[in-house]
Amino acid sequence: MGVGEFSRNLALPLHDIRLQTQVESLHEGYVRTSVGKISGDVIIVATDPITSAQLIGATKAPRMNRSTTWYHSLPEGEITAQRLRIDMKSSGPIINSIAISNLSPYYAPAGKTLVSTTTLENASESEVRRHLAHMWKVSTQSWDLVSKYEIKQSLPLHEVSQPLESSVKVRDNLFLIGDHRGTPSQQGAMNSGRRAAEQIN
């Protein structure tokens, strides 16, 4: 169980999925793709904010944040918390950290705990370890770095003056969904989809 359940469940009722097909333009009642025209009563654009802006002809796309996710393995039981940790004092490069295998044991082998940590700025592993030790109140010297993933355009930047939610309806029968229509998170993306579905029904 984990984030993969989102995509697996979303795909269950779908019978016509086109792979390796690029959407080239949007029109009233249809989209033009690399393999021809696909018609529909409603068009929902659900892609990254830059591609979305290009498809709907927006003059400005949201600015994007880069992020790095760090995965550390440690002995099971060293951390038992199941909640996301946030350093409100910003005393290091980490914005949040969570022992994800405490929520779903499928993320780590028996006897181990997997900690997932996110940084926005460039940081060395030693800086991350020091900040993790501060946040979790444990020594991190024996933690093993499993992997790290750098994503150049991971989340849209939510400006201070920006409303919490933006409209998902672009015009009649055209909707735009994604975390750029709300809070930059999986929750924001899912929420925008729900708002669009409610307006369509």
List each language-model region with its residue ranges.
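Short beta-strand to alpha-helix junction loop
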Residues: 1-12, 18, 121-123
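Short, well-ordered alpha-helix to beta-strand connector turns
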Residues: 14, 40-41, 171
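Short loop/edge segments at beta-strand edges and connector loops
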Residues: 18-21, 27, 178
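Flexible loop residues that form catalytic
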Residues: 22, 48-49, 151, 179
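Short, exposed beta-strand/loop patches in secreted or surface proteins that constitute
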Residues: 23-26, 166-168
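Mid-domain catalytic core of redox enzymes
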Residues: 24-136
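Conserved flavin/dinucleotide-binding core of flavoenzymes
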Residues: 100, 105-201
